Amino acid sequence: MAERESGLSGGAASPPAASPFLGLHIASPPNFRLTHDISLEEFEDEDLSEITDECGISLQCKDTLSLRPPRAGLLSAGSSGSAGSRLQAEMLQMDLIDAASDTPGAEDDEEDDDELAAQRPGVGPSKAESGQEPASRSQGQGQGPGTGSGDTYRPKRPTTLNLFPQVPRSQDTLNNNSLGKKHSWQDRVSRSSSPLKTGEQTPPHEHICLSDELPPQGSPVPTQDRGTSTDSPCRRTAATQMAPPSGPPATAPGGRGHSHRDRIHYQADVRLEATEEIYLTPVQRPPDPAEPTSTFLPPTESRMSVSSDPDPAAYSVTAGRPHPSISEEDEGFDCLSSPEQAEPPGGGWRGSLGEPPPPPRASLSSDTSALSYDSVKYTLVVDEHAQLELVSLRPCFGDYSDESDSATVYDNCASASSPYESAIGEEYEEAPQPRPPTCLSEDSTPDEPDVHFSKKFLNVFMSGRSRSSSAESFGLFSCVINGEEHEQTHRAIFRFVPRHEDELELEVDDPLLVELQAEDYWYEAYNMRTGARGVFPAYYAIEVTKEPEHMAALAKNSDWIDQFRVKFLGSVQVPYHKGNDVLCAAMQKIATTRRLTVHFNPPSSCVLEISVRGVKIGVKADEAQEAKGNKCSHFFQLKNISFCGYHPKNNKYFGFITKHPADHRFACHVFVSEDSTKALAESVGRAFQQFYKQFVEYTCPTEDIYLE
């Protein structure tokens, strides 16, 4: 403090050029003296009126703070040496007692105070009075502010102009300082340096001047009138937005700008009488490094009493920095998110030299910018997430096509299938339920010899996404081997990579014909998809569900079979097991998708065999493939067919709905023919009649009735 005093007294002759006080003129009544050092640790009263009207506080004031020597060129010739310190005390006390003006009857008290202030003599006090000021203030702990002499104490209701009218509120709201942060001003004293000693210029402010009058530009010392104007309700907004971070001030040399602002940027809207004038010239400083933003600081950290700063010289530094008085701290959070209020409603920016308004600092809108950034970031995250979904779906479509998990039997026979085709079943597919895939081998496409074989040769609507034993195929796969037709017996549930020559490669859902089950839990089987034989671990496959033996025996006794040549368009999972609307919707879905790929991926020709057992889709193969014995087919048991029919407007389209043997899922298979499919639908109906007749004869034999 001695260094600070010496620095100030040394600058009395000529103020430093870098000082923020380029011009300060004070015309103050002589006996205008305030007690002001109300620190935060004593600020515990719940009623603000007790602080201003009674003696429930300790008035602490350091000698070095109240006896600061005046500076030549800053104080007028008619002012004494202690006028600067008294003015700073007045400025502080006015902010502290501002809440008292919110109570009923405050306006009447203000008028009386204005009259008292106008009647005071204009003679400045002596230095002896200034020297006795700390002692008199320390004695005022047990007295009210209005009980002392006029030279030492303020009247009971000190002067306030109430330039910022507020809605009357309860005292609890006005003075909610019971949770105030302790030792905040002591930390700031020990960790920060004086702005006068460092010679740091004042940063550009949001409000350069609060006056409605502009000084003449030709005056030697450009000044501003901070007397009686400005009704800026946004003073609380900007002050709250400029709240310092909750942590202690920075101690590094590079952080002195932060500590400087922490000390001074709360001390702006000082309320003086109409007779008092302060002329300050704003000095622009280069933008300081980015300061940490504090988004929605708690009230105990963002608010700051004017008395928490022990350096009174800093109180007259800022001409335009907003400062929340105690009565305004709580409501400062109500307008955090309104950056539009950062400008005074009366008329924008008023600079001392008429210069255009400076660009607003980032720290002034740190909270609002953080809010807007959060919303923008949220929007970007949503967009990015949607983009990632699109990217992740494309390889999934490719995997469906490669892994034979698409919606059509023929689509997976060619690797060039469009991703649109693989998405056929998405509209009717429930999320947790796997879509039944359909696949026929390349043997069914004699017109495309160059297309490589599909990775998976699955049964119609076999679920490639379900790995449980209950997710079996919608139909059974059969294959002609050595002139004899065999149906699949097992289905692969895991992928098996062979490590020896005699092992069989398996993909998930491969149709298998197990020929031998060894005791060491290895199976010797034939892979109907690849046409290869080998061994694999028994736990890599499960047995498929077959029709009962008695039903198979009844079907073999029937010689009735109808055959129809059609082209298979595809299959799609549907939400319901019957209905013309369901059938037509599935046909429309598949036909629309197939139209996009009909040129490079034409539908496969097949033969529909209708019998009492069910419906078999036999793939038409060429002679070379038939010689190899690779003729394959898909079989659907008649008991699992729930609905069939042709399109009412175009009878060339035929479809039937099948139920999954184990799961509660349904799929619709669509075909197209060159001729009408009415005969096909009638054949399926006749098969149902025969099947029902045989079923009834088996379950309810007539001879049993006669025997009874």
From Swiss-Prot:
UniProt biased composition (Basic and acidic residues): 264-274
Biased composition (Acidic residues): 105-116
Motif D-box 1, residue range(s) on this chain: 350-357
GO MF annotations in UniProt: identical protein binding; JUN kinase binding; kinesin binding; MAP-kinase scaffold activity; mitogen-activated protein kinase kinase binding; mitogen-activated protein kinase kinase kinase binding; protein kinase binding
Pfam families registered for this protein in UniProt: PID, SH3_9
Designated name of the protein: C-Jun-amino-terminal kinase-interacting protein 1
Lineage: superkingdom: Eukaryota
GO cellular component entries: axon; axonal growth cone; cytoplasm; cytosol; dendrite; dendritic growth cone; dentate gyrus mossy fiber; endoplasmic reticulum membrane
